[in-house]
């Protein structure tokens, strides 16, 4: 990291880890990507599986899966990413930085401080800072956060109107409520994207998860981000995080 990044407000939430272990995501109606997309671009998990969660989080994911089955019986949950070691977090920050440099036609060796700061600002819109401080862990390094989407009755990813990890305004959960369509056809598409995102949020919230304010695909339960969001909704019933960094 080449400039001072202000700590996100949720990182001030205290952590009292409950000690639950990680367990494999092995649930009926829940699929995962193989090979893992980050491993495909070179991330080294050192033999560890990214498809693990804290046991309590795993139980809640199963609850969400059952809720989806009630609403869309032939659909399934697709887990894009779950547990992410700090080293992988750092790799993906560096990888995304390099992607932006290439996309914008810049020369990585001669970037000005202002250019670097602008690029890191974009990177940290999506990626948490790969911090080794146990008081401020990245959400995915706690085993309590996961990135997901939906699969249709043919086992194909449902079009959500944007890709996971996309660096654009389309990643905002309610993006399609804020843009004006230019045709009736586009209006129907936008409404469909929004309904699908709301369905994903509905099944996850029904199981106690809360969605990242800036990412339609990211949900967590019991980590600092979750506690911070919960406290915003319930100012008279404050919670702390009970999942911290896990190795």
Swiss-Prot record:
EC number: 3.4.13.22
Amino-acid positions noted as binding Zn(2+) in the UniProt annotation, renumbered to this chain: 140, 147, 218
Active-site residues, as the UniProt record annotates them: 215 (proton donor/acceptor)
Site (Transition state stabilizer): 84
Cofactor requirement: Zn(2+)
EC class (word): hydrolase
GO annotations of cellular component type: cytoplasm
Cytoplasm keyword on record: yes
GO process terms (BP): cell wall organization; proteolysis
Pfam families: Peptidase_M15
Location relative to the cell: Cytoplasm
InterPro entries, alphabetized: A_A_dipeptidase, Hedgehog_sig/DD-Pept_Zn-bd_sf
Protein family per UniProt: Belongs to the peptidase M15D family.
Function: Catalyzes hydrolysis of the D-alanyl-D-alanine dipeptide. May have a role in cell-wall turnover.
Protein name: D-alanyl-D-alanine dipeptidase
């Amino acid at each position: 990291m080449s400039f001072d990044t202000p700590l996100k407000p949720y990182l001030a939430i205290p952590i009292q880890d409950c000690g639950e272990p990680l367990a494999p995501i092995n649930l009926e109606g829940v699929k995962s990507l193989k090979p893992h997309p980050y491993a495909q671009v070179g991330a080294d998990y050192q033999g560890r599986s990214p498809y693990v969660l804290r046991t309590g989080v795993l139980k809640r994911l199963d609850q969400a899966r059952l809720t989806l089955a009630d609403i869309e019986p032939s659909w399934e949950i697709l887990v894009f990413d779950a547990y992410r070691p700090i080293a992988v977090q750092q790799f993906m920050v560096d990888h995304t930085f390099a992607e932006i440099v290439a996309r914008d036609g810049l020369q990585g060796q001669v970037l000005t401080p202002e250019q670097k700061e602008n690029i890191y600002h974009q990177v940290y819109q999506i990626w948490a800072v790969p911090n080794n401080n146990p008081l401020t862990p990245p959400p995915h390094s706690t085993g309590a956060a996961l990135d997901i989407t939906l699969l249709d009755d043919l086992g194909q990813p449902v079009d959500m109107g944007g890709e996971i990890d996309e660096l654009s305004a389309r990643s905002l959960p309610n993006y399609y409520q804020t843009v004006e369509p230019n045709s009736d056809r586009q209006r129907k598409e936008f409404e469909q994207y929004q309904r699908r995102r709301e369905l994903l949020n509905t099944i996850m919230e029904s199981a106690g998860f809360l969605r990242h304010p800036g990412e339609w695909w990211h949900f967590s339960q019991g980590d600092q981000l979750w506690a911070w969001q919960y406290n915003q909704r319930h100012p008279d019933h404050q919670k702390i995080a009970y999942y911290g960094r896990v190795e």
